[in-house]
From Swiss-Prot:
Known role: Catalyzes the transfer of a dimethylallyl group onto the adenine at position 37 in tRNAs that read codons beginning with uridine, leading to the formation of N6-(dimethylallyl)adenosine (i(6)A).
Transmembrane segments: none
A Pfam family matched in the record: IPPT
Protein known as: tRNA dimethylallyltransferase
Taxon lineage: Bacteria, Pseudomonadati, Campylobacterota, Epsilonproteobacteria, Campylobacterales
Gene Ontology MF terms in the entry: ATP binding; tRNA dimethylallyltransferase activity
Cofactor(s) demanded: Mg(2+)
EC top class, as a word: transferase
Chain residues that bind substrate: T11, A12, S13, G14, K15, T16
Site (Interaction with substrate tRNA) residue list: T100
GO biological process: tRNA modification
EC number: 2.5.1.75
Length: 289
C-alpha cells in the first residue's frame, strides 16, 4: 500500500541504514534527501549508499548529474514527483531520507516565485553585509554563494525586501500531512560516531576521490567545497597535515550536525532513539501494509 514518511536526523545518525533496512523488508522506494548524493562523482564524501544498496533498492535522488552541473530545490521537487509516481503506480511505500532539511521544508511549505540569480560582481561578504542591513530576518550562511546571489537577485529585480517577497509569492507545497521521524542521539555519542565515520571515510579512499575530483573539475564549484572535500584540498595543497585533516573534517561535521539539529526543530517530527527506531517503524509499516 502506498504511503510516505520522512526520516531525518543529523549526519552520522544512521538514517540511511534504517531506511535501507525498511526498504528491503517492505519493498519500499527510497528518495535520498541529500544535496551531495545527486552527484555521480562524489561517493565517499557524500556517504552515498553502496553499490549493493543502489542495485537492490529502488532509489531516487542519487547519481543524477555531474558536479559541474547545477542542482537546486526545484530539480529536487521534480525528482520527488518521479519517486512518488513510481511508488504510487506500484502501490509501494516511499521513504524520504536524508539530512538536507531545506529541501524537505520547501516541499512542505512550497516554492516562491522564480527570480534570476544576480550577476553582480559583489562578493559574499559584501552581499552578506547588505543582507544584514536590509533583510536581517533572512537566514543564509555567509559562505552560501548560490543563495546569497539569489537573495541579491530578488532585491535587484523587485526592490522588495526578499524575505517579504518570498513569503508573499509562496506557492502551495507538494507534501501534505507527511509523518516525519527524527533520529535522536546523545550529543557526545554522536561526536564519537562522527569521529569514527571520518576515519572510515579516509580509510576508504576519501583523499583519492578528492584528487580525482580536483584534477577534473574547477575547485571553486559549490559541490567541491563541501565538508570532507574542502579539507582534502587544503591537505593536497600542503596547507595542513594528515592529522589536521582528520581533525578538521570531524570538527566541521560536528558543527554541521549542530546546524542540522537546529534546523530540524522547524519540523513537527517524532523523535526516535536509534536503538528503538527500527522496531517502531517496522510496526508503522506493518500497520500501513
Amino acid at each position: 500500500m502506498f504511503f510516505e514518511i520522512a526520516l531525518i536526523g543529523t549526519t552520522a545518525s544512521g538514517k540511511t541504514y534504517i531506511a535501507n533496512t525498511l526498504a528491503r523488508e517492505f519493498n519500499a522506494v527510497v528518495l535520498s534527501l541529500d544535496s551531495l548524493c545527486v552527484y555521480k562523482e562524489i561517493n565517499i564524501a557524500s556517504a552515498k549508499p553502496s553499490q549493493d544498496d543502489l542495485a537492490s533498492i529502488k532509489y531516487f535522488g542519487v547519481n543524477l548529474l555531474s558536479v559541474n552541473e547545477h542542482f537546486n530545490v526545484e530539480l529536487f521537487i521534480r525528482e520527488y514527483q518521479k519517486a512518488k509516481e513510481f511508488a504510487l503506480a506500484r502501490n509501494l511505500p516511499l521513504i524520504i531520507v536524508g539530512g538536507t532539511g531545506f529541501y524537505l521544508k520547501t516541499m512542505i511549505d512550497g516554492l516562491s516565485e522564480k527570480t534570476l540569480e544576480s550577476k553582480s560582481s559583489l562578493n559574499n561578504d559584501e552581499i552578506y553585509a547588505l543582507l544584514l542591513n536590509i533583510d536581517p530576518n533572512y537566514k543564509i550562511e555567509k559562505n552560501d554563494t548560490y543563495r546569497l546571489k539569489k537573495w541579491l537577485g530578488i532585491y535587484e529585480q523587485t526592490r522588495e525586501i526578499p524575505s517579504e517577497f518570498l513569503k508573499r509569492t509562496q506557492k502551495t507545497g507538494v507534501l501534505k500531512d507527511i509523518e516525519i521521524y527524527e533520529l535522536a542521539w546523545d550529543k557526545e555519542i554522536l561526536k564519537k560516531r562522527i569521529k569514527t565515520r571520518t576515519k572510515e571515510m579516509l580509510d576508504n579512499g576519501l583523499l583519492d576521490e578528492a584528487k580525482i575530483l580536483f584534477s577534473k573539475f574547477d575547485h571553486k564549484l559549490k559541490a567541491l567545497n563541501s565538508i570532507g572535500l574542502k579539507e582534502c584540498k587544503e591537505y593536497l595543497d600542503g596547507e595542513i597535515s594528515f592529522k589536521e585533516l582528520e581533525n578538521l573534517i570531524t570538527i566541521h561535521t560536528t558543527q554541521l550536525a549542530k546546524r542540522q539539529r537546529t534546523f530540524n526543530k522547524k519540523f513537527q517530527s517524532k523523535a526516535l532513539e536509534f536503538d528503538k527506531a527500527l522496531a517502531t517503524l517496522r510496526m508503522k509499516f506493518s500497520i500501513e501494509k
